[in-house]
Amino acid sequence: MPNFYVIHNPHAGNGEHTAVTNNIRNMPNVIEWFDTEYPDHAIYLAKNLAKTLVDAEAVVLVIGGDGTLNETLNGLLQIQRHQYLPIAYIPIGTGNDFARACHIGSSDEVINRLQQIVKPKMINVGKIIGEAPHQTTQYFVNNMGMGFDAAVVAQTNHSKWKTYFNKLHFGAMSYAFTAFSTFFNQNSFPVTITNGEEYYHLHQVFLATIVNQPYFGGLAILPQADLFEEQLDMIVVEKMSFIHFLTLFIGLKKDGRHLKDQKVHHFTLQKGAQIHVHDIQPGQLDGEELGNGSFIFTTTLQTYPFWI
């Protein structure tokens, strides 16, 4: 039986998940419980667990949204260990794209299943090795984006509409609402992609996103993407009219026909592909703000054990 070490974001999902946390606290194999208290606190907590835990049955149980999951993953991977600590995940946030991609189900279903799992599944996570704006290595489970999608993340996180939609349990609607208002303020920018022996330079880019699974903000940006396949993809969208954008946006919620549009480019990235965003743009990693910068980084994949 696993021993669970819990990292819980009490603010996820507007904090309306007391019944879920009470059920988990009553589980006999919950060993320690940590509440996050400030941004990036989950990184610190996970790093500490990776440094100190010698429990062979330890599983880090994340209760929160995609952001808390991302912080935990990055904290655990900052420490070299003989064996990685598996991550279990109960989605209670407003951004639950990872849970959607893994078909995890509701929090109640996850709680019931946690005790029945006998070994973790190895899942691919994206890895970026940055040269600019910071020399750093970071990991993501969903996507890493620059331009429009990152601007939407930043605007949504600081918008009063996010709280309103979350209270109505329409978290994805906050992204959709912000997307339309952000469209008119997003400038185009040049991007260079060095992908194996192939080289691409696009001049009027509107959005550049590296994806590890189908969803962004609940929308299927790349329906065929699969967390269990050893592959990262990149979607690049060029600047377009608002009507054109609206047509594409509707397609995102259906069958992926947006990928056939002449303004949309899909690249299957080889390991070691290099991306260069030449102008200063906002960035996001699993829905968490990276700040603004001109980005230069290399992409690759790594597997990590998940208790799902």
Where are these regions (language model features)?
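Glycine-rich phosphate/pyrophosphate-binding beta-alpha loops
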Residues: D149, L207-L222, E289
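Catalytic core of DAGKc-family lipid kinases
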Residues: I79-A88, I92-Y200, Q204
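ATP/NTP phosphate-donor binding region
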Residues: M1-I63, N70, N74, I79, ...
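Short glycine-/acidic-enriched loop or helix-start segments at secondary-structure transitions
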Residues: E16-H17, E71-L73, A99-A101, A151, ...
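ATP/nucleoside-binding phosphotransfer catalytic cores, i.e., glycine-rich phosphate-binding loops
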Residues: N195-E197, L202, I221-L222, D226-E229, ...
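Short, well-ordered alpha-helical microsegments
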Residues: A42, L69-N70, G217, N292
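Glycine-rich beta-alpha junction loops
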Residues: P10, M144-F148, V211-P214, K239
